[in-house]
Amino acid sequence: MLKSNNASETVTHKVGDKTAKKVFFRRRKGCPLSVHNAPVIDYKNPELLIKFVSEGGRMLPSRITNVCAKKQRKLNNAIKIARILALLPFVFQAK
């Protein structure tokens, strides 16, 4: 039986009548925008913003990008402003 969770992973093996549990904790990586030399979140930087937008044009959630909540809000606002100013497209076209 295999159970997995976002923060930890539990593996259960059946050995005879007893079950043995092994718990593996994956260390969560920190926010890529909170490190020392991180780029500044700005609507005028579409190269940075496009990394946090999916192929369909939707903003990626923080559980996928590992961005902290504070930076995720700043990213969302910057992406919205960049779209309004036509620096980023609202919908990406399939090629």
From Swiss-Prot:
Pfam families the UniProt entry points to: Ribosomal_S18
Coiled-coil annotated residue ranges, if any: none
Organism: Rickettsia akari (strain Hartford)
Gene3D superfamilies in alphabetical order: Ribosomal protein S18
GO CC list: cytosolic small ribosomal subunit
tRNA processing recorded as keyword: no
Subunit text: Part of the 30S ribosomal subunit. Forms a tight heterodimer with protein bS6.
Protein name stated in the entry: Small ribosomal subunit protein bS18
GO BP annotation list: translation
PANTHER family, per the entry: 30S RIBOSOMAL PROTEIN S18, SMALL RIBOSOMAL SUBUNIT PROTEIN BS18M
Family according to the record: Belongs to the bacterial ribosomal protein bS18 family.
PROSITE patterns in UniProt: RIBOSOMAL_S18 (PS00057)
InterPro entries assigned: Ribosomal_bS18, Ribosomal_bS18_CS, Ribosomal_bS18_sf
Keyword Ribonucleoprotein set for record: yes
UniProt KW keywords: Ribonucleoprotein, Ribosomal protein, RNA-binding, rRNA-binding
GO molecular function, one term: structural constituent of ribosome
Family annotation (SUPFAM superfamilies): Ribosomal protein S18
Protein role: Binds as a heterodimer with protein bS6 to the central domain of the 16S rRNA, where it helps stabilize the platform of the 30S subunit.
Upper taxonomic lineage: Bacteria, Pseudomonadati, Pseudomonadota, Alphaproteobacteria, Rickettsiales
